[in-house]
């Protein structure tokens, strides 16, 4: 590699670490102060097909010149040469016939063909037409034999003449190409891979030299022809199933038509289909003097088929509604289908005596196939049928669903006979039109509807639209009946509507789907710009769609923004990334994922994810109304990553390990059923992975050799995969709903009355008069459907509230060290499960007693007390005077850390209790107490309090669970009550408590309290799953072992103290941040509120007597205690005479998404229900920064967006902004008005410097920063962008990356180092800025342009930015004065007028709000930035 280029950024320079600010993203539309013309995207003008006429006329003129000079001219192979000023066009002469005598001696040729096939009758006509015409159209019904026989007829004819013959036959599907080739080989007794062979993707049989008949997929032939730009390597090209009109087929037709006239006139082209539009294809392939002939091959049906339309069924009493013109199933549609089922049943029942077939036999062979447009309609139809069957027991129906997301086992049910005496009714989507044939279907009910995917090329958002099916679709559906007996088809539209209003054919894919791959093929063809090529398609797309596609390809780096250095809206030079993308059978963003995987040395992971994203239904889905087990399988495989794509990678890894272990077929199927994995899809994915690996190897895109450089460890890989996902799917960026509102965390805790939101959900609609504490166990049982055991749940109530609070108990450490379902952040898994329960069913019935009966019940059973007509349930609260909790007046306390689980959970014994604890220990270890041996292991149950040996002494303990026995010796897991640690203790180390000991100590609260580190949280860079890094825990353990520890109490919430630990080396909390093991974090609302109270109490401590301090502290602790679960035995159900419906459960952490794209700003965003993020919660509620979600695809319906293939990005402050800066085509980073800080980023494709209008405004993205981004960050990002470009900075003639392994290692090591530096910074917070002109590109011509090593050939050009100005001293003094004023109001006890914190741009409505605002990390950072220090 050029040393000057490698030295461009002087990478050898040593960088000193410094705290740097970070960026924050918001997609909140309210970020705009007011709505202006600039705040909404301009509607792009639709440019239609006017461009086509000029191009087609030019093409006709060219074709005429070619035809006129056909016999005398020589061939030129490019459009520019052919369309020259020369009067005479050069063409290649027709070659002489080539003999192949030796080849035909080598293989056996049996000329006896199957004469029973309908196609045989047309054999001579077909061969004659092929001999006499360059293009022949063959229309033959499904099953006539055209696919297998026509190529053999041609080959046999060549054999007779001893002429060379090379035939290629395309198939739209891989499996079809393989199976048909094998069938032909079997029929002709040829060794597979000799005379007849196949090729799908790069997978082909090894020896193709002797192949004369090749079956391949459409894409294989297309790629080959685009590469060689001639048809002459074949004598016959047979395009089968041309009616399907996918993009590959339409582009192949274009290429074949062009090359046939250009340089391959002797090649014969045969177009075949069962439902071909002969008129359209004849016109498209018409020569100047003639049209291609059409040969028709058909065969009669074995059993008759009768079709009925809605208006022809006069005897059925359905409502005489007018025919719907808008596609859809009306309120009566489902009922009408059921009426038809009843008519069919009655008809066969009446024919029982007149027919040779009995009624029971008719039901068995008379299955009904109902075509519905989607899964939702299938479920609705099933519910309607189910209700009718329940009401009419004699109407016996066996419902079978059939759609593409079903498991293979479920699909097999379609072919099984129904239960005895039942009629099978198959509810299906259009998958059964051609993919599945069920022999026993005798009736079809067709709603004549279908769902078609359309893509808006401007936004790149897809929408699944409900449309009327084409007549071709309906005929294919009708062809599903009458295999075993006569059949009937009922079309749920009128005959007039069917004949005169429904389209004959569907919309070609080129007119409704993304055009990226077609435009790339057009660029590779090198016969004109994309619009000139695509104008020649059979169905040319709108020019707007081509223009938008070119913009999208520029956005992903497949095209450069210029053509020969000049910007073109409709064209761009093909980049080296584009050349790679054109070689993959993938969406360009998935190809970009593979390229970035190569750059960041995680190529294999990227290949697996890309393959998994192309395969449908990797997971098996359940039907509506059921608790979807498959959903939790997504979580298991995602393993806490919050990423559907990483989940795919983990599924494949497990599958690959099973394959390598040679797991038996039965075992693999059991595994697939257990984890709801579609094994068939997984096998298809495996083939795709192998194919992509081969394609990468052919391009010299391979992983770095193991050991050549520093490889990513598991923790780093979890982040780097999200980095490349963010890069691949830019700009599909979404932000969780904005938390910048200062009232957010207060309302969060108010909603659940101070409970922990990370562990609590709530129901509504429970009136207090029902005395809820009586039904806590019944409420716990509601969660059994989510497999949450009742013993792990606390249910509490708030006086006067209709809410029921359900709090999940945290796992006792070490009980379950490998949780099955991991979730990101602090929120417990059970909260996700509870919210998912509500999504399945919002109402939960609960049986209760009326108030009078409830009063009688509690009086009779002496449960609680009744005072002033109010029931007071029994309480099990600890006496507050006995609690070992720090006083509200104590700022620091000394003592011992008795046990460390992690930095977020450890236990502390105050030094003041040392003598009392020693006295207790002495009592416990008296010989009298130690003589209470456990005689019967069954007496030791969960929750039992006893004595257990800890070290050399026995201490109080509570049993957590019974462990497995070893050699028949019982063991028990216990927690030591006064120390906090957990241990597994054998039965001989346990002692029961004597009655006296129970009386004295059973109600004594623990002699320690739980702590966590305050103002910090685990670094997302240093750890996964929001868990504390091991090294951080080791630092805390080291402090604990050193002896007496000084704790500074920040707050006390729910009996857990947030603390700062003072050591000789400084505050441990800060030390963890300095070592990048933790990052600074806000405390939540309850913690800040308690901290403020403690500060004010401690300021008045000297004025309060010791006695009053104790009384005030007890009142403080009493007030701080939350209600506890009473866990009462519920009343018998026969006494519960009322049924209420609880609504929920809800979580206050439920979040929504906002799109960051300008085109999606004012749209509602929903996450696909099968995504791991479909239950989207604020996983770090104390963190005022929000996380970004990246989506693989986006679909649109009206003003709603649905995102699929989602990935929750790491909770690294500024991550979204940094990723946008790193992977966007270009960006402008904007400053505040004083140019003292960066406040927002405008990213996109850039703008026209002459008009200042954006090139692709729909995809412009604004990111408002709330942490500081420094000039050094932009420098690092530019270095990374340069390195990414350097990985492919040149291609040789073979299109191989020219960077060698040694240079790749250097580049990767640089990238790795820079990325770690970029993400590892502890960034200071800044105030948010908003503007009405965020989407305006600014003229930055006054800036010196950055150096561009690769000039116009850079995929990632360098970013430029303004230097900071010095802060104005007057402004600093003003901000300091504002800060001083805020603090002057802090201890005010009355009401105040709203005040403005100018440091943070926040309005403070009350003194309480002001106090808590002063404690936020944002305000503390801003105080440092303006130089304010409190006296």
UniProtKB/Swiss-Prot annotation:
Annotated GO CC locations: nucleus; P granule
Coiled coil residues, start to end: none
Reaction(s) catalysed (UniProt annotation): ATP + H2O = ADP + phosphate + H(+)
Organism: Drosophila mojavensis (Fruit fly)
Location, primary (coarse class): cytoplasm
Domain Helicase ATP-binding: start-end pairs: 127-294
Name the record gives this protein: Probable ATP-dependent RNA helicase spindle-E
Subcellular location: Cytoplasm
Family: Belongs to the DEAD box helicase family. DEAH subfamily.
Broad class of enzyme this protein falls into: hydrolase
Residues of the Tudor domain: 937-1000
GO BP annotation list: dorsal appendage formation; germarium-derived oocyte fate determination; global gene silencing by mRNA cleavage; heterochromatin formation; intracellular mRNA localization; mitotic chromosome condensation; oocyte karyosome formation; oocyte localization involved in germarium-derived egg chamber formation
């Amino acid at each position: 590699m050029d040393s000057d280029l490698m030295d461009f950024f002087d990478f050898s320079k040593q960088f000193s670490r410094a705290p740097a600010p970070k960026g924050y993203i918001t997609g909140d539309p309210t970020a705009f102060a007011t709505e202006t013309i600039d705040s909404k995207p301009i509607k792009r003008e639709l440019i239609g097909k006017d461009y086509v006429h000029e191009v087609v006329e030019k093409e006709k003129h060219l074709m005429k010149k070619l035809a006129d000079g056909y016999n005398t001219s020589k061939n030129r192979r490019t459009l520019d040469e052919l369309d020259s000023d020369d009067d005479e066009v050069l063409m290649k002469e027709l070659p002489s016939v080539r003999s192949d005598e030796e080849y035909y001696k080598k293989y056996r040729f049996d000329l006896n063909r199957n004469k029973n096939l309908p196609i045989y009758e047309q054999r001579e006509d077909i061969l004659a037409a092929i001999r006499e015409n360059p293009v022949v159209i063959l229309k033959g019904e499904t099953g006539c034999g055209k696919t297998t026989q026509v190529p053999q007829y041609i080959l046999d004819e060549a054999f007779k003449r001893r002429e060379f013959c090379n035939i290629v036959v395309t198939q739209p599907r891989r499996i079809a190409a393989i199976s048909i080739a094998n069938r032909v080989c079997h029929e002709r007794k040829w060794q597979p891979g000799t005379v007849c062979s196949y090729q799908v993707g790069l997978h082909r049989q090894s020896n193709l030299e002797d192949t004369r008949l090749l079956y391949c997929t459409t894409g294989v032939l297309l790629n080959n022809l685009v590469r060689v730009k001639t048809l002459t390597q074949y004598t016959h090209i047979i395009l089968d199933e041309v009616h399907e009109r996918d993009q590959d087929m339409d582009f192949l037709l274009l290429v074949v038509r062009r090359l046939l006239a250009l340089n391959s006139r002797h090649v014969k082209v045969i177009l075949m289909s069962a439902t071909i539009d002969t008129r359209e294809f004849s016109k498209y392939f018409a020569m100047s003097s003639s049209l291609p002939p059409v040969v028709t091959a058909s065969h009669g049906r074995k059993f008759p088929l009768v079709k009925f339309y809605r208006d022809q069924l006069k005897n059925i009493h359905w409502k005489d509604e007018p025919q719907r013109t808008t596609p859809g199933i009306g309120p009566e549609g489902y009922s009408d289908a059921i009426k038809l089922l009843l008519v069919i049943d009655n008809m066969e029942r009446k024919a029982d005596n007149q027919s040779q077939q009995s009624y029971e036999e008719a039901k068995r062979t008379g299955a009904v196939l109902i075509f519905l447009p989607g899964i939702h309609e299938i479920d609705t139809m099933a519910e309607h049928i189910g209700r009718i069957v329940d009401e009419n027991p004699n109407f016996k129906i066996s419902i079978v669903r059939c759609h593409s997301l079903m498991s293979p086992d479920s699909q097999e049910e379609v072919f099984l006979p129904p239960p005895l005496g039942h009629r099978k009714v198959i509810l299906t989507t259009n998958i059964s039109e051609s993919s599945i044939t069920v022999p026993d279907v005798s009736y079809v009910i067709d709603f004549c509807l279908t769902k078609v995917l359309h893509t808006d090329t401007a936004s790149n958002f897809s929408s699944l639209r409900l449309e009327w099916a084409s007549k071709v679709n309906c005929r294919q559906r009708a062809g599903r009946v009458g295999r075993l007996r006569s059949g009937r088809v009922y079309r749920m539209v009128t005959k007039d509507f069917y004949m005169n209003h429904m389209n004959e054919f569907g919309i070609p894919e080129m007119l409704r789907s993304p055009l990226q791959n077609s435009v790339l093929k057009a660029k590779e063809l090198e016969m004109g710009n994309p619009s000139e090529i695509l104008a020649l398609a059979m169905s040319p797309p709108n020019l707007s769609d081509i223009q938008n596609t070119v913009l999208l390809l520029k956005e992903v780096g497949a095209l450069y923004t210029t053509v020969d250095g000049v910007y073109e809206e409709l064209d761009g030079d093909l980049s080296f990334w584009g050349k790679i993308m054109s070689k993959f059978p993938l969406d360009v963003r998935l190809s970009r994922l593979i390229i970035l995987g190569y750059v960041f040395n995680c190529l294999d992971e990227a290949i697996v994810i890309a393959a998994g994203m192309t395969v449908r239904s990797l997971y098996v889905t359940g039907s509506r109304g059921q608790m979807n087990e498959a959903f939790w399988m997504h979580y298991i495989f995602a393993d806490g990553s919050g990423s559907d794509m990483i989940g795919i990678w983990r599924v494949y890894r497990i599958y690959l390990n099973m394959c390598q272990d040679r797991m038996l077929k039965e075992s693999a199927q059991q595994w697939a059923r257990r984890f709801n994995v579609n094994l068939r899809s997984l096998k298809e994915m495996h083939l795709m992975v192998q194919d992509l690996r081969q394609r990468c190897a052919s391009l010299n895109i391979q992983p770095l050799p193991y050991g050549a450089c520093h490889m990513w460890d598991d923790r780093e890989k979890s982040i780097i995969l999200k980095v490349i996902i963010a890069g691949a799917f830019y700009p599909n960026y979404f932000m969780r709903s904005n938390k910048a509102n200062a009232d957010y965390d207060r309302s969060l805790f108010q909603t659940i009355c101070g409970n922990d939101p990370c562990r609590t959900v709530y129901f509504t609609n429970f009136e207090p008069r029902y005395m809820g504490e009586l039904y806590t166990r019944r409420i716990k049982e509601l969660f059994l459907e989510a497999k949450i055991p009742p013993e792990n749940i606390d249910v509490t109530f708030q006086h006067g509230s209709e809410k029921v609070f359900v709090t999940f108990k945290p796992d006792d450490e070490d009980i379950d060290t490998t949780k099955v379902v991991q979730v990101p952040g602090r929120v417990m898994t059970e909260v996700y499960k509870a919210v998912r329960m509500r999504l399945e069913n919002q109402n939960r019935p609960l049986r209760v007693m009326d108030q009078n009966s409830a009063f009688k019940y509690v009086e009779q059973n002496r449960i609680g007390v009744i005072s002033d007509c109010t029931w007071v349930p029994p309480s099990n609260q600890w006496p507050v005077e006995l609690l070992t909790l720090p006083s509200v007046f104590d700022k620091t306390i000394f003592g011992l850390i008795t046990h460390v689980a992690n930095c977020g959970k450890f236990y502390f014994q105050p030094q003041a209790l040392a003598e009392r604890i020693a006295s207790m220990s002495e009592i416990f270890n008296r010989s009298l107490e130690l003589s209470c041996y456990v005689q019967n292991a069954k007496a030791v149950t969960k929750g039992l309090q006893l004595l257990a040996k800890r070290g050399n002494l026995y201490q109080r303990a509570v049993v957590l669970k019974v462990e497995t026995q070893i050699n028949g010796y019982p063991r028990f897991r216990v927690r030591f009550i006064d120390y906090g640690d957990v241990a597994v203790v054998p039965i001989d180390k346990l002692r029961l408590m004597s009655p006296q000991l129970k009386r004295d100590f059973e109600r004594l609260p623990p002699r320690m309290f739980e702590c966590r580190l305050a103002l910090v949280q685990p670094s997302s860079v240093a750890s996964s799953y929001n868990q504390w890094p091991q090294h951080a825990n080791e630092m805390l353990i080291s402090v604990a072992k050193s002896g007496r520890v000084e704790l500074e109490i920040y707050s006390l919430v729910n009996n857990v103290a947030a603390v700062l630990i003072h050591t000789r080396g400084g505050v441990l909390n800060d030390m963890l941040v300095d070592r990048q093991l933790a990052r600074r974090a806000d405390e939540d609302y309850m913690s800040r509120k308690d901290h403020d109270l403690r500060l004010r109490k401690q300021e008045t401590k000297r004025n309060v007597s010791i006695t009053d301090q104790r009384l005030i502290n007890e009142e403080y602790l009493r007030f701080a205690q939350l209600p506890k679960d009473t866990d009462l035995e519920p009343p018998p159900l026969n006494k519960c005479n009322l049924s209420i419906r609880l609504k929920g459960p809800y979580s206050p952490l439920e979040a929504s998404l906002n799109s960051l794209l300008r085109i999606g700003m004012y749209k509602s965003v929903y996450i696909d229900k099968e995504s791991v993020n479909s239950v989207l919660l604020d996983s770090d509620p104390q963190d005022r920064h929000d996380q970004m979600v990246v989506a693989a695809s986006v679909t649109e319906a009206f003003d709603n967006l649905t995102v699929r293939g989602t990935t929750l990005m790491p909770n690294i402050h500024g991550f979204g902004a940094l990723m946008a800066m790193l992977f966007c085509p270009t960006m402008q980073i904007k400053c505040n008005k004083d140019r003292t800080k960066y406040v927002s980023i405008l990213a996109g494709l850039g703008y026209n410097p002459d008009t200042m209008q954006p090139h692709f405004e729909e995809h412009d993205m604004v990111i408002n920063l709330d942490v500081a981004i420094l000039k050094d960050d932009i420098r690092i990002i530019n270095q990374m962008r340069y390195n990414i470009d350097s990985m492919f900075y040149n291609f040789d003639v073979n299109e191989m990356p020219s960077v060698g392994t040694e240079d790749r290692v250097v580049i990767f090591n640089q990238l790795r180092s820079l990325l770690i530096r970029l993400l590892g910074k502890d960034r200071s917070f800044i105030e948010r800025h908003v503007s009405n002109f965020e989407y305006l590109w600014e003229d930055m011509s006054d800036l010196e342009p950055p150096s561009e090593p690769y000039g116009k050939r850079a995929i990632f050009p360098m970013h430029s930015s303004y230097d900071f100005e010095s802060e104005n001293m007057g402004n600093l003094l003003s901000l300091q004065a504002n800060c001083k004023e805020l603090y002057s109001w802090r201890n005010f006890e009355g009401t105040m007028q709203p005040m403005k914190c100018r440091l943070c741009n926040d309005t403070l409505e009350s003194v309480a709000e002001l106090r808590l605002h002063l404690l936020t990390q944002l305000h503390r950072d801003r105080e440092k930035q303006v130089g304010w220090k409190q006296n």
